UniProtKB/Swiss-Prot annotation:
Natural source organism: Schizosaccharomyces pombe (strain 972 / ATCC 24843)
Protein name: Inositol phosphosphingolipids phospholipase C
The protein's Enzyme Commission number: 3.1.4.-
UniProt keyword annotation of Transferase present: no
Native organism taxonomy: Eukaryota, Fungi, Dikarya, Ascomycota, Taphrinomycotina
GN (gene name): css1
Cited InterPro entries: Endo/exonu/phosph_ase_sf, Endo/exonuclease/phosphatase, Sph/SMPD2-like
Length: 424
């Protein structure tokens, strides 16, 4: 009697660094990505930072023989940069924007303007089961100093974990992938794996791995990729920034790209970092990230969902970070509103003073000064301080309210319904 073989899914996630007018050799690199994907036998491909619809169409045309179904997601002013390719029919899809997603005054970052979020799709697998697919790109920390965007990234991790949890509870085959901009076993990582009811595929395949393997400093560049799973800032990547000699042990190489899966419906059989080669003729890496490839085996008989909740310590840590951030942002909001209130009488006074000014050129200078003062007051005081300040603050209040609810549930479950909790 033959034993039925469990079907497998070969999944790829890749941040393609496709920023228009910024990324070098963007068109050539993304075309090379499409050409390489066309030669591979992936079932599902999730791409991030594909900002141009034309780049998406180029890749789609190249891979359409194998990956018949595709979706490009639109969001905000500049687009989400998220794309999906699949062998299986896409029966439903949507773009879910994060409630907290950077600040408009940091226009050079761009996160607020691109409307980052979670691209979701439901795929019809030949077995008749539904694959719930999630593709995302969380807010980057930016810089080596204090991570002022950590609170937003925690909120984003919480938001996607709620979507994942709902899909797992429906019994779907859940796969979430992308550039999460988080370190393994960090607070955002713990939120996703515990409340989202998913496993980190890399840790599923290599359970002994932690954030920094004990023998990390004895590893060469290749081992750091193959064993530690680093996908960003590796010395093997030609786009890595120049670093000083004190970083020779590859301190800055990080594992930021992930594939998460629902352990109740599928099992991670293999995980590896790919797209390590250089683009032919250009002699450069395909992107400033490497890609992560995972092979998942679909369980013929799904097991009951083991419902975990976020631990007390994780909730407390998250609340502490959020309260600290709220205090800072409340101060900034009040200062900006004060700027607006102070500017109003000042603008009126300058307008009155123009009547007593001679010669005419001085009036022009004062009028120009008044215009600039008005623009600064409206943009900084009204738009950023009042409108966005309240927008962000209300988003933070909602985040805190949901965390407090979870804290109460943790206490109630500990008393009445003991459940396995995530490791704190």
């Amino acid at each position: 009697m033959s034993v039925e073989k469990a079907p497998e899914l070969r999944v790829l996630s890749f941040n393609c660094w496709g920023l228009r007018f910024v990324s070098k050799y963007r068109t050539e690199r993304l075309k090379a990505v499409g050409e390489k994907l066309a030669k591979c036998d992936y079932d599902i491909v999730l791409l991030q930072e594909v900002w141009s619809i034309y780049d998406f169409q180029e890749i789609r045309n190249l891979v359409s023989c194998n990956l018949v179904y595709s979706r490009f997601f639109h969001s905000a002013a500049m687009g989400a940069g998220l794309a999906m390719f699949s062998k299986f029919p896409i029966i439903e899809s949507s773009m879910n924007k994060y409630p907290l997603n950077g600040r408009p005054q940091a226009f050079w970052r761009g996160d607020w303007y691109v409307g980052k979020g979670v691209a979701t799709a439901s795929l019809q697998h030949p077995s008749g089961r539904i694959i719930s697919l999630f593709n995302t790109h969380l807010h980057a920390p930016y810089g080596k100093g204090a991570d002022t965007y950590l609170c937003h990234r925690l909120s984003q991790a919480w938001y996607i974990s709620k979507l994942l949890r709902a899909a797992v509870q429906r019994g779907h085959i859940v796969i979430a992938a992308g550039d999460f901009n988080i370190q393994p076993l960090s607070v955002p990582h713990e939120i996703i794996t515990s409340y989202g009811l998913v496993n980190d595929a890399w840790l599923s395949v290599y359970p002994d791995q932690v954030e920094h393997p004990p023998n990390r400093f004895s590893m060469n560049d290749k081992e750091l990729v193959e064993i530690a799973g680093t996908t960003c800032d590796s010395r093997l990547n030609t786009w890595r920034e120049n670093i000083s000699s004190k970083d020779m042990d590859d301190f800055v190489a990080k594992r930021l790209d992930y594939v998460f899966h629902s352990p109740s419906t599928c099992e991670a059989k293999n995980a590896k970092v790919v797209f390590l080669e250089r683009v032919p003729k250009l002699d450069c890496s395909y992107s400033d990230h490497f890609a992560i490839e995972t092979v998942l085996s679909i369980k013929l008989q799904p097991i009951p969902v083991q419902e975990t909740r976020v631990s007390y310590s994780i909730i407390d840590d998250t609340l502490g970070i959020t309260y600290q951030y709220m205090a800072r942002e409340r101060l900034h909001m009040r200062l900006r509103i004060a700027h607006l209130l102070i500017s109003i009488p000042l603008i009126i006074g300058v307008h009155v003073a123009i009547a007593w000014c001679d010669p005419a050129w001085l009036k022009v200078i004062i009028l120009f000064f008044t215009v600039m003062l008005t623009i600064a007051a409206v943009v900084n005081g009204f738009c950023i301080g009042l409108l966005f300040g309240r927008w962000e603050f209300n988003g933070l209040l909602e985040f805190v309210a949901e965390l407090k609810e979870q804290k109460l549930l943790c206490k109630q479950y500990l008393v009445d319904h003991p459940l396995p909790f995530a490791k704190s």
